[in-house]
Amino acid sequence: MKKNRRDFIKNIGIVGAGVGLLAPVATMAIESQNENLLLPDDDGSKGEVVLNILQTTDVHCQLHPHDELFWENGKAVFRKTGGYSMLSTYLKKERKKNPYSFVIDTGDMFQGSELSVKTTGQALVPILNALKYDLYIPGNWEVIYGKQNMQKLLGALQAPKICANMYHDLGDGKRGELIFQPYYIWHVAGVKIGFLSYTDPLVPLRQSPAYSKGILYTQPEENLAHFVDVLKNQEGCSYILLLSHLGLSQQIHLANQEACSGVDYILGGDTHERVRKPIVCKYSKVVEPGAFGSFVGKLQLKIKDGKVISDQYFLDEISEKNCRADSSMDKLIQSFEKPFTEEINKIIGYSTEPLYRYFVIENTIDTMILDALKWKLPEVDVVLSNGFRFCPPRVTRDHTGNVPITNGYLFDMLPVDSVVRVAEASGKQIKEWLEKELNNVFAKNASERFGGWVVKFSGMKVIFNAFGEKGKRVQSVEIAGSPLDTEKVYKLSACERQGDPEDVLCRMKGVKNSRNTEYTLHKAITEYLEKNSPVSPVPHKNAVALDAPETLLTQVWGVDYEFK
């Protein structure tokens, strides 16, 4: 593996040259270089011009076409989508059709695959640069390799980066300068389009705290109104787009706050939601274009007499029916994957069931992970696993008639090979923790929703009201078939979160006798598959909502939106 990494670094030398020459970030905003992009015989004020703003988000390093889940006619159906080669073709076609095109990515571009892990994200840099994005913002997972690596990776991308709520942590609670510029201005067709950006301020809670060490996050409301005022009244922007990685619930909440007055659209990310029709809120419209490169959000703004007179939004599917693979992008990807191809494609087991992670409550991917950990740690009462959203489905069967699980797909499911940790907690602690976790997902107040789906568990059965009263959602809990005893001490396991205190396990505070095992998640799952393949990870209905279907696909409610 060391040789493979050396070969890769030699292959990617051009990236290193760019990374080492990062300019210090100024506090001033960025403005586009092509000050007045105009078509021939168009002075930007006569006639009508259509701006074509294209958005990807949460691609999670999914380089190749993959199986994707769609909800159609009341059931899950699957088809092939995504991959940077088809995305490259799509973007080239869009730019050719409309030179007023502007391409953005709203985060989570360096976490989610084995190639990214093996190269600390560096393999993605030349691929992203080849796609010629115009603007980036950091997602919640850009910190996966630490602050310094985040700065180097984003610094090596050949387009501006903006974010108005990530600051250098000077220590002792002292806030330094912004890490990235707060906004960007696109001068086009005689108008100014302002872009302002915010990422998730809850990163230190959602991810291992060590990942974001050296960074201070603030709530968007702290300076949003200020920067909107700057863009409108100082810079003279005709239209303001807020690029965010907050999650759809949080974005809807923000769009209903007075601080968002003056923002025309929120182009969001994080929760992998597929908004096909803009959600109209009090101050702004909100959209989010899915994940894994399966879709591109397309916002078209019609300009006349130096003003935006109308907007249209589309969610374009990236699939073989409308995009052929770009051979030059294919070759570029293969050149960086070559040192690792054999390991990535190595089959480590099989599943008789389609593998997916789209349902809010239980999924086959998480069931397989829990089954593996319960098999490895039979002495543990309850096995816990995070409610991750990332990882596309895998349903295509090979000659065996089963779904192959490769080493690369193991990294797609669990990019962080965390150590398995055990600890003890009382029944009372478990009950209180469950209430908090359920509120994170289903809170009536959208601003209180954060993180992924419902936390996953095995060895415990929980019946709850998803949309019940805060602190009173849990109706019953059983562990090993017996009612939860609030006084009894139970043994739990979960992944270690680097930087957590000794008495915290999977966000549960005050646990006792915590220790790391000799197993990592990957080791436990690999050994489980070696002994038990093919596996049949049918969800065990350990989590049952009385007021929601087991096929619930979104935590967003109270607005005109449906995941499909």
Feature locations, PLM:
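Acidic, metal/ion-coordinating pockets
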Residues: K3-E320, V360, T364-A372, V383, ...
